[in-house]
């Protein structure tokens, strides 16, 4: 999608960290900050962000695909930003949560039903003193 926004032909070739960062940097011509997700980084899958907070986040690629993980990533990212985290920390939190949700989903689970993230929801709520 990022390559389409930049009017390029989409490619699935693996990127290195510098190319991932450059892709995010180029998107700041269209918006003040940007996060590009689903980047193939060799044995990792990652995201890169640009704007006032530049970063590359990598997680070990898990060879399973589920619908809804992009929506889950976005929800955790926004929630983490609302909690006051920097964009780089929010992106890392979201990537880690999605990775854990994929790992938490039984191998025999029909992928059409998405990942089992519900047991992990307490990880998203900071402890509070009442």
Residue ranges and their predicted role:
Residues 52-62:
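Glycine/charged-rich beta-loop-alpha catalytic/anionic-binding loops adjacent to active sites
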Residues 55-56, 80-94:
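Phosphate-handling active-site elements
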Residues 8, 37-39, 59-60, 69, ...:
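Fold-independent oxyanion-binding glycine-rich loops
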């Amino acid at each position: 999608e990022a390559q389409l926004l930049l009017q390029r032909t989409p490619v699935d070739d693996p990127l290195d960290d510098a190319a991932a960062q450059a892709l995010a940097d180029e998107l700041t011509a269209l918006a003040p900050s940007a996060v590009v997700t689903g980047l193939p980084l060799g044995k990792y899958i990652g995201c890169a962000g640009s704007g006032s907070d530049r970063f590359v986040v990598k997680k070990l690629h898990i060879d399973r695909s589920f619908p809804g993980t992009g929506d889950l990533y976005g929800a955790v990212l926004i929630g983490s930003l609302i909690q006051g985290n920097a964009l780089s920390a929010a992106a890392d939190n979201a990537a880690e949560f999605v990775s854990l949700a994929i790992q938490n989903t039984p191998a025999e689970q029909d992928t059409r039903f998405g990942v089992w993230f519900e047991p992990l929801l307490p990880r998203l709520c900071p402890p509070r003193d009442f």
